[in-house]
Amino acid sequence: MPRKINKLSKTVRQYNEIDISGDCMKYWRAIRYWALDKYQITSPDLDMLFFLYSEGLFHKSKFHEFDTIFNWDRKRFKRLLEDGWIVKWRDSAPGQTALYTMSFKGKKAINTIYKVMNGEPMGEQTPMFRTKKTYSKGVYRNFIKKLNKEFRESKQRRGTESQ
């Protein structure tokens, strides 16, 4: 009796390419390190500024509502207020609570970070670029220089393609 031979079918996996035009988080770690160094701010404080950026006017209770997900820091609100990241917009009065908003300094910092995330070169006038204090700062500095070069070349390519 002849033996049956089963033909094995070979499955071919398809590669589904994704649209990476909005890949702004690719270099987030380096951008965050640069921003923390440039603005001399902590990572939770920066996250709080990102939250407040779109809030407009807010109460202190709204601030503390988002603050609960960070490590415990009772002085965060006071520090951001004293350092000029947020400002009092309205004093409290009978029947009204005080209102706060992000300062021009805070809005400009977050706006700059968004621009960098969308491909603008990072400024090299930060403490990280002035002196090589630690090995990690040197590594980040070299990586950021490489990124800036890549961002500039990409911007030039887009400029020549659109003409």
Q: Which sequence ranges carry the predicted segments?
A:
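Short alpha-helical segments that sit at the start of domains
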Residues: 15-48
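Short, cationic-aromatic polyanion-contact patches
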Residues: 41-42, 91-116
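Short amphipathic alpha-helical elements of helix-turn-helix/winged-helix folds
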Residues: 48-55
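Short amphipathic alpha-helical interaction segments
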Residues: 68-82, 96-97
